[in-house]
Regions:
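Acidic/polar, glycine-enriched structural segments that form the non-catalytic walls/loops
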Residues: 1-50, 84, 91-94, 124, ...
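A short glycine/serine-rich beta->alpha loop
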Residues: 4-7, 47-52, 97-103, 160-163, ...
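Acidic, mature catalytic/reactive cores of soluble proteins
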Residues: 16-20, 131-137, 141, 178-205
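Secretory-pathway/luminal and periplasmic proteins that interact with or process carbohydrate-rich
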Residues: 24-30, 87-93, 142-143, 200-209, ...
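Extended glycan-interaction surfaces of carbohydrate-active proteins
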Residues: 35-39, 43, 127-161, 209-244, ...
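Aromatic-rich carbohydrate-recognition surfaces in CAZymes
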Residues: 52-180, 193, 239-252
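Acidic/polar loop patches that form or flank catalytic/metal-binding clefts of enzymes
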Residues: 74-78, 125-127, 187-191, 203-211, ...
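Conserved small/polar residues in nucleotide/adenosyl-binding loops
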Residues: 291-292
Length: 293
């Protein structure tokens, strides 16, 4: 699918090993006769292959956009799997494993995968049904969505990982707004386009960081290097740059390009020492030289 040229074999080894790692999952869940276990934990049959292990919080940023470029037929099969999981289990996947909704990780990043596939022209006959599933998953009465819709952010005392959820929901909502516009759903376009700007409500212009709010005020004793319950496997350094859908808006919040570049330089030049809890799984990756984008 991808050929690179290099006079150094080690460069080729690194690249192709990384490419191989990127396609270890999702995994085929269909048997040779078309039977598969879906998100209602019952056995179904489909002539189109179905898949499992959609760890979408890990893969929505880069992996699925890569698939949409080099594995277009397989992406259409992923969309068909999403449709079946929606029909059988009642919602689009967030972090699906072997037909189970694991309840793991945040956001509703299946909407990002679907939107990217749609605008990259992945052939699929039922985008409108997936769009209905997008609206449903973005309006559930749990995981901080009600206060997010009411206040324009998630208060830290009402939901864990409030800053990360606010930021990722805003990105997801931008994706939905683009689908709404493409499908001529004006009312939902206006609603979700407004929600996509909610990231601004957790930006503290005095510090230049995305911070938690408690009862409408900035939470006290804030440190951007602290790993705590307000962020998902990260601290404020990583999440303060997570506005992939509105980089120009983020730059404006910082007061322009010069001040934004200054903040980026702070990110890469600050100490990698973290404060707070030791984050399981990726503690070594949480340093200020890395950011969620």
């Amino acid at each position: 699918k991808i050929n690179i040229k290099s006079s150094t074999d080690s460069v080729k080894t690194i690249f192709y090993t990384s490419l191989y790692h990127s396609i270890i999952a999702p995994n085929l869940i269909s048997d040779v006769n078309g039977l598969y276990r879906s998100t209602d934990l019952k056995i179904h049959k489909d002539s189109i292959p179905n898949y499992t292990v959609f760890s979408l919080w890990d893969t929505f940023r880069a992996t699925h956009p890569l698939y949409n470029l080099i594995f277009r037929k397989k992406t259409a099969q992923f969309l068909n799997t999403f449709q079946n999981q929606l029909r059988n289990g009642g919602q689009l996947p967030i972090w699906e494993l072997a037909g189970n909704y694991t309840g793991c990780m945040i956001g509703y990043h299946s909407v990002s995968v679907i939107t990217d596939a749609y605008f990259k022209g992945i052939p699929f006959s039922n985008y409108p049904e997936l769009y209905d599933g997008m609206l449903s998953i973005a309006n559930r009465s749990k995981l901080g969505i009600p206060p997010y819709k009411r206040f324009g952010y998630i208060p830290s005392h009402s939901e864990s990982e409030s800053v990360s959820k606010t930021l990722e929901y805003a990105y997801n909502d931008w994706c939905i707004s683009k689908m709404a516009l493409a499908l001529s759903d004006t009312l939902n376009y206006l609603d979700f386009n407004e929600r996509a700007q909610f990231y601004k409500n957790v930006f503290n212009n005095k510090t230049g960081f995305m911070q938690p709010k408690y009862n409408g005020n900035w939470s006290p004793s804030f440190s951007p290097s602290e790993v705590n319950f307000n962020y998902t496997e990260a601290n404020s350094w990583q999440y303060s740059f997570f506005v992939p859908h509105d980089i120009s808006g983020l730059i404006n919040l910082h007061g322009g390009s010069a001040l934004f570049n200054q903040k980026l330089n702070e990110l890469f030049n600050s100490s990698s020492t973290i404060e707070g809890r030791k984050q399981a799984d990726i503690t070594g990756l949480i340093a200020v030289s890395y950011t969620h984008l």
